[in-house]
Amino acid sequence: MVVVGLGNPGPRYAFTRHNVGFLFLDFLKSKDWKTEKYFAWSRIKLAGNDVALVKPLTYMNLSGLAMPHVLKFFNASPDDIIVVYDDVSLKLGRIRIRKKGSDGGHNGMKSIIQALGTQEIKRIRVGIGDKPEGMDLVDFVLGEFSDEEWIILNKVFEVMKEALEVILIEGTEKAMSIYNSLEVRV
């Protein structure tokens, strides 16, 4: 399995809502990242399986540029990938696991679907909440989480780790049935 967390590279974006994919991978493994031309990567053991963690080093909207290189490097197919990314249409504390689907208006996922030529890509969408009324969407997703939001997000990351283990052991459908209805609260 290759878990691809979406985000923007560099310290300016490190802790923004849009970088929730990168943040989750850092939650799983914060050290020992290696860098290739288009992506950073590491490996972990999860539920007894070797799992590759990948952060595309292109900017979010160009995430797909890294994917052919990722597939070749890990000798993987689109079926081996799970993409993790932010979703403003989901409340903070919620996740949605899907086996396939459209980009849902997310430009990073759109780029990946275009690059791989398929919508048959597993994904975990991470709720980052509704933007405040009157706030620009870009400003919201490129804003940082509050201290209270971090408490929820860390609990969400624990749940996401469990969900990945279920995907590995029992399959995506089982994980969907367990985790898509959960809401993490403080």
UniProtKB/Swiss-Prot annotation:
The active site is at residue 18. It is found in: Cytoplasm. Its main location: cytoplasm. The record marks 86 as: Stabilizes the basic form of H active site to accept a proton. GO terms for cellular component: cytoplasm. GO terms for biological process: protein quality control for misfolded or incompletely synthesized proteins; rescue of stalled ribosome. Coiled coil: none annotated. Keywords: Cytoplasm, Hydrolase, RNA-binding, tRNA-binding. TRNA binds at residues 13, 59, 61, 107. It comes from the Bacteria. PROSITE patterns: PEPT_TRNA_HYDROL_1, PEPT_TRNA_HYDROL_2. It holds the Pfam family Pept_tRNA_hydro. Belongs to the PTH family. Hydrolyzes ribosome-free peptidyl-tRNAs (with 1 or more amino acids incorporated), which drop off the ribosome during protein synthesis, or as a result of ribosome stalling. This is Peptidyl-tRNA hydrolase. It comes from Thermotoga petrophila (strain ATCC BAA-488 / DSM 13995 / JCM 10881 / RKU-1). The lineage of its organism: Bacteria, Thermotogati, Thermotogota, Thermotogae, Thermotogales. The gene is pth.
